[in-house]
């Protein structure tokens, strides 16, 4: 399945966690969105996970699509499977994934070349509230749970 097939029904939060300094950074894209490849539509509503998610929503397929489309090193980014959020849009269900860089330092130059910058959660005020709530869930999972060790 190609990146073009995957992206309409998925969004990705990109994060980097430095366990030494306990710094958690999130990518913010040039359009102000915190989601790749684009923000959710304003009409999107949170929903429970569907009974049967198809292959287009598979976390590894989404990770591979991001690697392919953005030229990332697959050995440096992991899918955090415990993060399971969904939104209903006019086009159908959208899964929001959390991908975390495992490099010792945040790949700031790489992200900037893609049109984004890394920020701490507190620096993201003014972003869409729905996206900030998703980042708060990611923060709780990574800092307070097992997501930082994945």
Predicted feature residues:
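Amphipathic alpha-helical regulatory segments at dimerization interfaces
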Residues: 2-4, 68-69, 84-86
């Amino acid at each position: 399945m190609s990146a073009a097939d995957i992206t309409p029904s998925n969004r990705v939060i990109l994060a980097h966690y430095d366990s030494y300094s306990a710094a958690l950074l999130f990518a913010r894209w040039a359009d102000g969105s915190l989601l790749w490849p684009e923000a959710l539509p304003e009409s999107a509503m949170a929903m429970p996970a569907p009974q049967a998610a198809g292959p287009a929503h598979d976390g590894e397929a989404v990770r591979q699509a991001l690697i392919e489309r953005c030229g990332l090193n697959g050995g440096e980014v992991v899918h955090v499977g415990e993060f399971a959020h969904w939104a209903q849009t006019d086009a159908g269900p959208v899964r929001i994934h959390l991908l975390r860089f495992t490099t010792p330092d945040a790949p700031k130059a790489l992200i900037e070349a893609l049109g984004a910058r890394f920020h701490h959660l507190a620096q993201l005020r003014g972003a869409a509230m729905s996206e900030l709530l998703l980042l708060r869930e990611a923060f709780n999972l990574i800092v307070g749970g097992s997501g930082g060790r994945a």
